[in-house]
Amino acid sequence: MQDFTKYLSTAPVLSALWFAILAGLLIEINRFFPDALLFPFG
């Protein structure tokens, strides 16, 4: 189990988890506020 927790704290696993969370957050923001880039120019 200690090896598994050490594996989960390695850089590729943490970066993949971070990018998945970030992508989900961006998708949800775009779902609730679509075309947010067009607001300042509108």
Curated annotation (Swiss-Prot):
Compartments where located: Plastid, Chloroplast thylakoid membrane
PANTHER family: PHOTOSYSTEM I REACTION CENTER SUBUNIT IX (PTHR36082:SF2), PTHR36082
Biological function: May help in the organization of the PsaE and PsaF subunits.
Protein name: Photosystem I reaction center subunit IX
Keyword field contains Plastid: yes
Keywords: Chloroplast, Membrane, Photosynthesis, Photosystem I, Plastid, Thylakoid, Transmembrane, Transmembrane helix
InterPro entries recorded: PSI_PsaJ, PSI_PsaJ_sf
Superkingdom, natural source: Eukaryota
Keyword Magnesium found: no
Gene: psaJ
A GO BP annotation: photosynthesis
Family in the record: Belongs to the PsaJ family.
Recorded topology in the membrane: Single-pass membrane protein
GO cellular component, one term: chloroplast thylakoid membrane
Protein's organism: Chlorokybus atmophyticus (Soil alga)
Predominant localisation class: plastid
Ranges annotated as spanning the membrane: 7-27
